[in-house]
Amino acid sequence: MSNNVTEKKWWQSAVVYQIYPKSFQDSNGDGVGDLRGIMERLEYLGKLGIDAIWLSPVCKSPQADNGYDISDYQDIDPMFGSVEDMEALIKEAKKYNIRIIMDLVLNHTSNKHRWFEEAKKSKDNPYHDYYVWRDGEEGVEPNDMKAVFGGSAWEWVPEIKQYYFHQFLPEQPDLNWENPQVRKEIYDMILWWMEKGVGGFRLDVIDQIAKEPDKKITINGPRLHEYFREMSKETFQKGDLITVGEAWGADPERAKLYSNPDGSEFSMVFQFEHIGLDQQEGKDKWDLAPLPFLKLKQIMNRWQTELYNCGWNSLFWDNHDLPRIVSRWGNDKEYRIESAKMLAILLHGMQGTPYIFEGEELGMTNVRYNIEDYRDVEIQNVYKERIAAGYDKEDVMNSIYAKGRDNARTPMQWDDTENAGFTTGTPWIKVNDNYKTINAKSQVDDPDSIFNCYRKLVSFRKEYPVLVDGSFKLLLAEDENIFAYERKNADETLLVVCNFYGNTVKMPLTEETEDMGLLISNYKETEDSSVLRPYEARMYYKK
């Protein structure tokens, strides 16, 4: 037996809840969520039963890219509170057995970070080599590399007649990981947060730190895993942490390195292969296409089977960059409750650590705003670009409704009072109009709510070892409507069967489930077990 099964880690049966702090709970009436606001809602999260909170970035930042441009790693942005508030949150969360996971951006800093302000003063400055510089002349860039957010990846600094490299915004200069001093500063900072009781880290675009711009290498550079192993040894392995690397360029082979059970790199990896399925081949996320259902099954099957016993999956539908899953692959009108529960049951039966994004457990939906009500710079940019390029306005807006990041960033819907109980002030972004019917207050005590479906699924991970260590077998691979799979260990069998669509279909696994008990389903009563109703999901179990 491999060591990740025999020596179970706490995070293998854990569920993580992601908070986008700006939109979760405002405690001081300024319209922006903050750390004290999160503390006010710990009881709710305790009720849900989650084990850890992942906070989107809260370090000090000029907010050129929603906090992913850090100007001080050892301070909290005043918008969210102070280091003292962070310490109080860690302490308070501990009472509910909840750990705090910080979002760390180690590929780049803000251009307002003191390291960069020093670095650009002169080539002899001790901080100069903290970043990636190339000689050149104005207008003649070192090469034609492009930044992720558009435009060149090189920015000219006339004072020192050099270009610096930035894979993202010009306000986000890339750190030079080849410099051991940079690595030491980063490790010292991680240890500083660990001493304050932080329970883990999510590492943003971590597969880009070993870039070699002269060879046009951005992801998966030659020294990538060397850096990971050094960082893990110097920091993470000194505590009992959960660590997750965000890797847009990962395939299962590489993910096995990231999440090697020997703990030499990270606990797990975020991969996004299933997330790009509903866009046109070779185009970007705004070019919509229907979800190829069989391909979704194939991809999830591959990650489940290939990482079994030699790596670890992260399971997620939603995050701060993605549209709401019930609107995306469910049905947010007539079957909102059924389809939200189906998507939850489908994901939470798999092997890995599930992540719930704030409001997902309530079945919060996408929004349809006028263009001026959106706050995301990406939405504003794509609107301007596409209208200027002659796209039909209705098509552009439909793409924004479907894929805009602000779908995930509207305020958490706590109750049916003004601003959904999020703030007493004016919210930084409009609240979704449906908050009067979709909110936490109406669901927490309703046994049939989406919230209580999630609560049960969270508790199952502690109750049924098969969810943590069972093998995975995809069933009915060619079925166009049903997603079904079996999990098995020496003592238990679990079978999940989900009707992914809004039509009634025949239930093909009646014999297989005959001697099994029903653990959870998303319809109150099973009138006729030989059919699956729209979006019906069932989880069967036997010991």
Where are these regions (language model features)?
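Active-site and adjacent substrate-binding regions of carbohydrate-active enzymes
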Residues: S2-K543
